[in-house]
Amino acid sequence: QYAQKKKGLAKWVFQREFELLAQYEDKVCAEFDHSLFVSPDEAKLFRDRQPKSERTKVHGLLNGVDVDFFDPNGKFSDEPLVPSKPFISFTGAMDYWANVDAVIWFAKKVWPLILQQQPEAIFCIVGGNPSSDVKALAQHQGIEVTGRVHDVRPFIANAQCVVAPMQIARGIQNKVLEAMSL
């Protein structure tokens, strides 16, 4: 999927990385009794590449969330960076390519439409190690980039909306489960 989104040298690098990683994964799968994946969909993608003799060893797990930690009635810390105006939040590691792609896409394609209706709204991008492309989004009207925060829960619980506009990642994202829990 990454290769399909890129051009030129980056496309070649992602495609080559996929090919090498696939060879390695196939070799490792043959050496173990079971292979576990983060979702049934991910397991199916891998299973479909395997010889029939290896397919029964491949299993998908379901994501979960700590419902005690992400309890809407629980207490969480005061977080000084939580906007005082209505806001939309995105949470995640902001040096992970799929998250970077998601917030850039949202900022370009969706955020201007929201600002037309709610000029005072804030898009709060929450997560450690924001890339330079993510930091640059803070120059746009209504976009705040927090970087790493002590407690992500206030940014989820107090948001009018939590978005996960992932264009690439497969499976259920933990950020979605956390938002639904709160």
Model-inferred region functions:
Residues 1-23:
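Acceptor-binding helix/loop patch of EC 2.4 sugar-transfer enzymes
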Residues 30, 48, 55-158:
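Conserved catalytic-core segment of nucleotide-activated headgroup transferases in glycan assembly
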Residues 153, 174-182:
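Short alpha-helical segment that forms part of, or immediately flanks, the ligand-binding pocket
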Residues 33, 142, 157-171, 182:
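Acidic donor-binding loop of glycosyltransferase active sites
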Residues 44, 97, 170-171:
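Short glycine-rich, flexible loops that bind phosphorylated cofactors or substrates
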Residues 22, 26-57:
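A short, active-site helix/loop in glycosyltransferases that binds the activated sugar's phosphate group
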Residues 39, 92, 166:
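Glycine-rich, N-terminal phosphate-binding loop of Rossmann-like dinucleotide-binding domains
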